[in-house]
Amino acid sequence: MSASAIATTRHDWSLAEVKALFQQPFNDLLFQAQTMHRAYFDPNRVQVSTLLSIKTGACPEDCKYCPQSGHYNTGLEKQKLMEVQKVLEEAARAKAIGSTRFCMGAAWKHPSAKDMPYVLEMVKGVKAMGLETCMTLGKLDQEQTLALAQAGLDYYNHNLDTSPEFYGSIITTRTYSERLQTLAYVRDAGMKICSGGILGMGESLDDRAGLLIQLANLPEHPESVPINMLVKVAGTPLAEEEDVDPFDFIRMLAVARILMPKSHVRLSAGREQMNEQMQALAFMAGANSIFYGEKLLTTANPQADKDMQLFARLGIKPEAREEHADEVHQAAIEQALVEQRNSELFYDAASA
């Protein structure tokens, strides 16, 4: 691969091009992905995050993969929004074991007005500890997005899950365009985007390629791209889906790395089902971020000490916390606020 090819970041990928990447011989694909990875990252550093469920279960969405959906009987005990102090205690614990980013997830269709003040206090408190902050709260409106940005939220997670064509087979309570709109609000507010998808839901190769195309062809690539392997939970409609071929999963990571060379590609849900050899291949394919700890929201994750033992055997070290230019972040927020105020001054006759 030429130096000029490595330096080019694209936003115009076609389905034919991406499928051709998937269909390369395995070794060729991994070589291309690893070459791209080394052009932008230290191949022996992996970003480490901890994920905490701050509100569990009884979600009104009908995502067929999710044990938190109120539509399915999975035996999951629902819990109300966690107290702010408890969240901060968990964040301190995460920092103590080596995490540099603390992600907070709530099983909501969207956050309510009464819950937003508590959510904002969580962001401010975790940020004050010196951790990067990330949240996944469902769909956001512009006002909520700006409030999160002003509180200091670094990343917002909102996955696209799959291709637009397959999406309706998995979720009916939220549209694909609504997901894209939330991502646009997040970007306009000056925050960073975490967005990816899930393998193993019965999707085709075209759907896997289509998901990556949606992400890679955004105006700016997501800074973080979580690639999840379906965790099959009894009671959900996808509990009996066939397992993903491990090599197909590695191919997905490799193609994500090639399409979005500057993004962190996260080895996310399903890592509990992966042996050490598969995880090592994932890092070779360009994965450079993991969730660290015992749970991913409601499903098991490899224990923290096992992760560090594997890192030691592979010569991998946790990535240091990314330092943000606060003045740049603040400038983006201020610009977004100005644009919102300006838009409120104009009456749209077409909407009447």
Swiss-Prot record:
Binding site for [2Fe-2S] cluster: C103, C134, C194, R266
SMART domains hit by this protein: BATS, Elp3
Entry's Gene Ontology BP terms: biotin biosynthetic process
Protein name (Swiss-Prot/TrEMBL): Biotin synthase
Gene this chain is encoded by: bioB
Domain spans labelled Radical SAM core: 44-262
UniProt pathway annotation: Cofactor biosynthesis; biotin biosynthesis; biotin from 7,8-diaminononanoate: step 2/2
Domain of life: Bacteria
Catalytic activity: (4R,5S)-dethiobiotin + (sulfur carrier)-SH + 2 reduced [2Fe-2S]-[ferredoxin] + 2 S-adenosyl-L-methionine = (sulfur carrier)-H + biotin + 2 5'-deoxyadenosine + 2 L-methionine + 2 oxidized [2Fe-2S]-[ferredoxin]
A Pfam family per the record: Radical_SAM
GO-annotated molecular function: 2 iron, 2 sulfur cluster binding; 4 iron, 4 sulfur cluster binding; biotin synthase activity; iron ion binding
Residues that bind [4Fe-4S] cluster: C59, C63, C66
Cofactor: [4Fe-4S] cluster; [2Fe-2S] cluster
Cofactor, how bound (note): Binds 1 [4Fe-4S] cluster. The cluster is coordinated with 3 cysteines and an exchangeable S-adenosyl-L-methionine.
InterPro entries, A to Z: Aldolase_TIM, BATS_dom, Biotin_synth/BioAB, Biotin_synthase, Elp3/MiaA/NifB-like_rSAM, rSAM
EC top class named in words: transferase
EC number: 2.8.1.6
Keywords attached to this entry: 2Fe-2S, 4Fe-4S, Biotin biosynthesis, Iron, Iron-sulfur, Metal-binding, S-adenosyl-L-methionine, Transferase
PROSITE patterns: RADICAL_SAM
Function in brief: Catalyzes the conversion of dethiobiotin (DTB) to biotin by the insertion of a sulfur atom into dethiobiotin via a radical-based mechanism.
Entry-linked CDD domains: Radical_SAM (cd01335)
Assembly mode: Homodimer.
